[in-house]
């Protein structure tokens, strides 16, 4: 994971490879791979099925309609994702990887 962490208006976010040209940045988009099958996660329906198989459940108590949230009864972890899959980026991917070690991997798309 390369880039620069930017703190603005009380929010910290990762700006990946800020010095790369636009075409290079577009070619280096990240994808998340489900390791047991080698499948690239390409939609929320696929991701939700995988997360449910790992014990995650949809969480509807957050009140924010712009987010899809998942929780695990056996932990205090909460996964929050933008409802629009086109906004699903490496920050959200790495959050899932950290909370599900050995099941997911983030890599550059080809």
From Swiss-Prot:
Coiled-coil parts of chain: none
One of the GO biological process terms: positive regulation of flower development
Functional description taken from the UniProt entry: Modulates the competence to flowering of apical meristems. Involved in a GA-dependent response in apical meristems during the transition to flowering.
Miscellaneous note of the record: Overexpression of FPF1 results in shortening of the time to flowering.
PANTHER family named in the record: FLOWERING-PROMOTING FACTOR 1-LIKE PROTEIN 1
Family named by the database record: Belongs to the FPF1 family.
Protein's recorded name: Flowering-promoting factor 1
Organism from which the protein derives: Arabidopsis thaliana (Mouse-ear cress)
Gene: FPF1
